[in-house]
Amino acid sequence: MAKVLVLYYSAYGHIEKMAEAVAEGAREAGAEVDIKRVPELVPLEIAQKSHFKLDQAAPVATIADLEHYDAIIVGTGTRFGRMSSQMANFLDQAGGLWMRGALNGKVGAAFTSTATQHGGQEVTLFSIITNLLHFGLVIVGLDYGFAGQGRLDEITGGSPYGATTIAASDGSRQPSETELAGARYQGRRVAEVAGKLKG
């Protein structure tokens, strides 16, 4: 059985919901799954004034956690066309793991959210995937076996590079069922690939 870590940062809860769906999909494929979040860098007073979702149940991850999993699925909201500074800060601290090759051969994947349909989803996914490739992970995207990729009857996230959601400029839009289904699909695929690589 593959061990999968869903590692995320979510300021307003959209990525938290996507992380739960990713984890659900991985569990459906028989994986043992943990959901963890990276530390918040925004001072508490500012986070409260900005209405950040501060009641997230997932425990905070440590760098040492990463090498204990067969797969790591990373999710974060987009910040001006790149991953959030919270996630970048966390991954930047994993240089020791990189130096030892501790993550080589593990499976990696990425998911994200943006405020708008063309708000930088794919470039954000690439900013995550680039990091994972440097760490030696084998990348799994959201392949076209997921039928929701081809929908034209609704505005929806999703890319061959990873599951995505659109939150709206004011954060009022929650992940749609199609977007959550894409996240579950990607979680399943990662768990399946990790299981095969683990043997």
Swiss-Prot record:
Domain of life: Bacteria
Record keywords: Flavoprotein, FMN, NAD, NADP, Nucleotide-binding, Oxidoreductase
PROSITE patterns: FLAVODOXIN_LIKE
Co-factor remark: Binds 1 FMN per monomer.
Binding site for FMN: 10-15, 78-80, 113-119, 134
Enzyme class: oxidoreductase
Binding residues for NAD(+): Y12
Record InterPro entries: Flavodoxin/NO_synth, Flavoprotein-like_sf, Flavoprotein_WrbA-like, FMN_Rdtase-like_dom, NQO
Flavodoxin-like domain span: 4-190
Any one GO MF annotation of this record: NADH:ubiquinone reductase (non-electrogenic) activity
Binding site for substrate: W98
Reaction(s) catalysed (UniProt annotation): a quinone + NADH + H(+) = a quinol + NAD(+); a quinone + NADPH + H(+) = a quinol + NADP(+)
GO cellular component: membrane
Cofactor: FMN
UniProt EC number: 1.6.5.2
Family: Belongs to the WrbA family.
Protein name: NAD(P)H dehydrogenase (quinone)
Organism per entry: Methylocella silvestris (strain DSM 15510 / CIP 108128 / LMG 27833 / NCIMB 13906 / BL2)
